[in-house]
């Protein structure tokens, strides 16, 4: 799915989830090597969490709390990062659609002109 994306942004929370998954699997070294190659691509940028991300996190958390629709805390950080950067979120996790103002897409084709 990402092979054809002109630009890919991921935050450090997603990176942590990937590395954790690798550690729990049977191909950690190979997966880490593939990840390293992926991160070295000029198409890929790693977004750090900032004070602005934390502010966005608080707003997302509060909005979902008021609606009685909580989502996992890592996903709050992911949504907050996308909102902070004005980026669409490519995901199959439908609970992201509960986040006000977040553009969620399920197919890369929905992001391409």
Regions inferred by a protein language model and the residue ranges of each:
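PIN-domain endoribonuclease scaffold, especially VapC-family toxins
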Residues: 1-84, 98, 102, 106-110
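Short glycine/serine/threonine/alanine-rich loop segments
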Residues: 87
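Nucleic acid-binding interface residues in structured DNA/RNA-binding domains
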Residues: 90
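Conserved catalytic-core motifs of GNAT/GCN5-like acyltransferases
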Residues: 94
């Amino acid at each position: 799915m990402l092979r054809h994306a002109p630009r890919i942004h991921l935050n450090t929370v997603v990176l942590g989830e990937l590395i954790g998954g690798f550690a729990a699997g049977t191909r950690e070294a190979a997966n880490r090597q593939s990840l390293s190659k992926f991160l070295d691509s000029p198409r890929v940028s790693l977004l750090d969490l900032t004070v602005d991300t934390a502010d966005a996190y608080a707003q997302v958390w509060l909005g979902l709390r008021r609606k009685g629709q909580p989502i996992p805390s890592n996903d709050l950080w992911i949504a907050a990062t996308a909102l902070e950067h004005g980026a669409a979120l490519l995901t199959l996790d439908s609970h992201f659609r509960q986040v006000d103002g977040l553009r969620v897409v399920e197919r890369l084709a929905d992001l391409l002109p």
